[in-house]
Amino acid sequence: MLHLAGQDSRTLARRAGISLEDARRITGAVIGRGAPLRDARNVRRSVLDEVDALATPGELRLLESVDAKDGFRKYLFELPDGLRVETVRIPLYDTHHVVCLSSQAGCALGCAFCATAKLGLDRSLRSWEMVSQLLAVRADSERPITGVVFMGQGEPFLNYDEVLAAAYALCDPAGARIDARRISISTAGVVPMIRRYTAEGHKFRLCISLNAAMPWKRRALMPVEQGFPLDELVEAIREHAALRGRVTLEYVMISGVNVGEEDAAALGRLLAGIPVRLNPIAVNDASGRYRPPDEDEWNAFRDALARELPGTPVVRRYSGGQDEHAACGMLASRRRGD
């Protein structure tokens, strides 16, 4: 896949100095159909030559794909420099798919419950490497792909410009044609970039990984709390909600750690008056250090949330793909059996 696959048609037109119409035709070929540049229709050869001269050859190599029992499919890709990343295809309603993309090879944030954190950070992905994950999964899918979540390996807001470039390439009507409202970008709470994202007015859904409402507890789970404290994060959430609408807060539930009555009460105090959606999800920890709550613990936590955050949507996310380590928090860039 060429470097230009990571650009939307307007960016391509500006950088290549070509007409927007030609850029749309090229985007339609490379991203819309997953075809080579030379297969762009109704574009003069001289224009293709100009664009080709700007493109950097490179491709993602599919090393392996494995199917979980519940229909999730995990892909292991090798990047041009030999690094590996994983991508997950998520089935929805037996009619379409959502794709979970990685934005970095590894991650530097060190969240205690996440397998990717144990890898450390090798590098950030380029926009075309993220778009190419989607194109490879699409080529392997009979059902349409109608949504994208930047929730795979890495911290998207520590690769801000490339992630936004990929998101705009994916929602380009000339390319992948994914509704921008169905593209979600998740962050562990990089406050300056949240504020920049809010100020710039992007149309994608913002998701923030919260996981605890007490600073000391969040710091133990997420070292990012040391650099971007909870009070600053909540102010950034409040600002975004006021200007751009409801924020989705992800909450990894860990038995005996963050699902007690006191945790629900702390969430109620922290989020009072802020329009948010809370998405709890059970922890997935292959190491066995952390356990998900059982049904009684979840039910008690849910009821406590209803009391402490009346009117706040609380939607429990399904934790799929566990048997093949395709679930949230389990991506470790390994082949099956490694």
Curated annotation (Swiss-Prot):
PROSITE patterns listed in its UniProt record = RADICAL_SAM (PS51918)
Q: Which InterPro entries match?
A: Aldolase_TIM (IPR013785), Methyltransferase_A (IPR040072), rRNA_lsu_MTrfase_RlmN/Cfr (IPR004383), rSAM (IPR007197)
GO molecular function annotation: 4 iron, 4 sulfur cluster binding; metal ion binding; RNA methyltransferase activity
GO annotation, cellular component aspect: cytoplasm
Q: How is the cofactor bound?
A: Binds 1 [4Fe-4S] cluster. The cluster is coordinated with 3 cysteines and an exchangeable S-adenosyl-L-methionine.
Q: Which cofactor does it need?
A: [4Fe-4S] cluster
The residues covered by the Radical SAM core domain are: 93-322
Q: Which Pfam families match?
A: Radical_SAM (PF04055)
**Claim: Iron is one of the keywords in the record:** yes
In the UniProt entry, which residues are flagged as the active site?
E86, C328
**Gene3D superfamilies per UniProt:** Aldolase class I
Q: Which CDD domains match?
A: Radical_SAM
- Where does it primarily localize? cytoplasm
Residue positions annotated to bind S-adenosyl-L-methionine are: G154, E155, S186, S209, L210, N211
Q: Which residues bind [4Fe-4S] cluster?
A: C107, C111, C114
**UniProt keyword annotations, A-Z:** 4Fe-4S, Cytoplasm, Disulfide bond, Iron, Iron-sulfur, Metal-binding, Methyltransferase, S-adenosyl-L-methionine, Transferase
Q: Could you tell me which cysteines form disulfide bridges?
A: C100-C328
The protein's superkingdom reads: Bacteria
Indicate whether rRNA-binding appears among the record's keywords: no
Q: Where is this gene product found? A: Cytoplasm
Any single GO BP term: tRNA methylation
Q: EC no.?
A: 2.1.1.-
- What NCBIfam families does the database record attribute to this sequence? PRK14470.1
Family, according to the entry, reads as follows:
Belongs to the radical SAM superfamily. RlmN family.
Stated name of the protein: Probable RNA methyltransferase Adeh_4229
